[in-house]
């Protein structure tokens, strides 16, 4: 699915959406998601869309539902956010209550729950310890209590953390286990796609693991190289900082060829990179010393 969002300042969003939707459908077969908070832009996009549009989004706010649900005449599926006038609830049960209210309101407009995909709103776990658990619990409740499809912005969970892809992949698997229907993620991420293929193979969604095997056909099964054994000897920076002369000499020698000299009975080791720099400094000093001094 290709997300289409034209919400830029000082831009006529309805006009731009009307221009862009036909142009995109002329160059790609991907389904389009009409992503806008402007009901007029949403209607223009849905009216011109060739097929069944996916719109993002409606929420539990009364104003939002009253603006979006009348557009059912164009057909389509809506992403439904589990938030309302009070914001994003802190508990899974409260998010379920919003989802239930959206389903009931949609039904009054003739919209079946099958045309709603609920986003239980994953936020950064670095800022809120329950940011992962709550949307997952809400997702499971919506699947079991309402029987509705679900979606998550998976990468939101890792914002502010190092090695985000690892966190994203783990969260993605946790969500899939709870019945996630669709995810906003990077399809070019090998870690994410490998996790998805492995899950499908293990969960009986990949007959005879054929898709997994085909995807891994070019991968090597050789184990990764072992990490070098830890050495008791400190590395060069540590030895210098700690004032360990002999260890510093040994560490410098272990790093490869070095320029060596003897001065005052002490061995001086110069790494090739430093030797190159010293060469240029020496040349510069020669030039400076050759210049006539000011009177």
Language-model features, listed with the residues they occupy:
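Short linear/disordered segments characteristic of secreted peptide precursors
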Residues: 269, 275-277, 288, 294
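Active-site pocket-lining segment
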Residues: 119-123
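ATP-dependent carboxylate/acyl-activation modules
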Residues: 1-9, 14-17, 22-29, 33, ...
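Short hydrophobic transmembrane-like helices used for membrane targeting/insertion
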Residues: 262, 268-270, 281, 287
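Short, exposed beta-strand "edge-strand" segments with a Pro/Gly-rich flavor and a Y/T-containing core
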Residues: 106-110, 278, 290
């Amino acid at each position: 699915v290709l997300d289409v969002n034209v919400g830029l300042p000082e831009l006529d969003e309805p006009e731009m959406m009307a221009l862009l939707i036909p142009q995109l459908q002329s160059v790609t077969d991907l389904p389009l998601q009409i992503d806008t908070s402007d009901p007029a832009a949403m209607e223009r996009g849905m009216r011109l869309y060739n097929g069944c549009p996916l719109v993002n989004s409606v929420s539990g706010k009364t104003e939002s539902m009253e603006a979006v649900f009348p557009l059912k005449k164009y057909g389509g599926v809506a992403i439904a956010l589990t938030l309302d006038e009070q914001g994003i609830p802190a508990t899974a049960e409260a998010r379920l209550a919003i989802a239930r209210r959206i389903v009931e309101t949609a039904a009054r407009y003739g919209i079946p729950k099958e045309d709603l995909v609920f986003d239980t709103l994953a936020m950064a776990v670095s800022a809120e310890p329950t940011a992962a658990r709550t949307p997952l619990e809400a997702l499971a409740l919506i699947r079991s209590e309402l029987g509705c499809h679900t979606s998550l912005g998976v990468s939101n969970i890792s914002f502010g953390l190092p090695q985000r892809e690892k966190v994203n992949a783990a969260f993605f698997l946790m969500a899939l286990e709870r019945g996630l229907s669709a995810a906003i993620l990077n399809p070019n991420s090998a870690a994410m796609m490998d996790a998805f293929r492995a899950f499908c193979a293990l969960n009986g969604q990949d007959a005879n693991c054929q898709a997994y095997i085909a995807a891994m056909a070019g991968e090597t099964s050789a184990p990764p190289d072992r990490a070098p054994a830890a050495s008791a000897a400190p590395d060069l920076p540590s030895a210098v900082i700690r004032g360990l002369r002999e260890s510093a000499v040994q560490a410098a020698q272990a790093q490869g060829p070095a320029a060596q000299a003897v001065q005052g009975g002490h061995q001086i080791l110069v790494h090739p990179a430093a030797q190159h720099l010293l060469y240029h400094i020496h040349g510069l000093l020669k030039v400076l010393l050759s210049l006539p001094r000011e009177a």
